[in-house]
């Protein structure tokens, strides 16, 4: 069977209506891209996945939205990330991408922690806020007085203790893994 017909059949089977006159593919090559999707093969057969180009674009847009320059107030940044990620996930929700979503989700949690860490600016503020969030004083002093960069500092035990996933979700973070599971179940 021709790969292009197979691609249309798989995408139509997953409830995406494809207008045949507008989207026609004559052949499929190794990194075949069709409406942002690609086909993969594993032991169970053929599956739909996201092409690498949209992945790069998605990550660069998230990087731009969670930039340290933009993070003056974290709430508007979280809202913009939520709007963009929700739209992207709703479009690409039929694709199999659980591992990639988990990787980007962990990276995005780290970016948000870094933005919050940068907002605190002074070591005294960092130590005080960590202690308020329930971190032991000695760990808070170590993390708050570090002279390493923002990215390194948010890898410390103290910062991860203070800003857990649950706390970030309660403050408005859009968890990509949870959203992907709820979207992907519907297909």
Task: Give residue ranges: language-model regions.
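Non-catalytic terminal/accessory segments
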Residues: 1-187
């Amino acid at each position: 069977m021709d790969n292009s017909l197979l691609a249309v059949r798989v995408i139509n089977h997953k409830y995406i209506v494809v207008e045949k006159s507008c989207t026609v593919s004559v052949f499929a090559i190794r990194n075949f891209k069709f409406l942002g999707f690609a086909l993969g093969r594993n032991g169970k057969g053929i599956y739909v996945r996201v092409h690498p180009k949209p992945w790069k674009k998605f990550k660069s847009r998230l990087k731009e939205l969670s930039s340290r320059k933009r993070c003056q107030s974290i709430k508007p940044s979280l809202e913009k990330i939520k709007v963009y990620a929700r739209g992207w996930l709703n479009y690409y929700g039929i694709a199999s991408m659980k591992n990639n979503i988990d990787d980007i989700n962990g990276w995005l949690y780290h970016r948000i922690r870094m933005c919050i860490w940068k907002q605190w600016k002074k070591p005294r503020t960092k130590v005080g806020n960590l202690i308020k969030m329930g971190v032991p004083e000695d760990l808070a002093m170590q993390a708050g007085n570090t002279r390493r960069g923002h990215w390194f500092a948010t890898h410390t035990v103290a910062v991860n203790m203070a800003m857990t996933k649950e706390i970030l979700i309660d403050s408005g973070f859009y968890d990509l893994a949870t959203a992907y599971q709820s979207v992907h179940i519907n297909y």
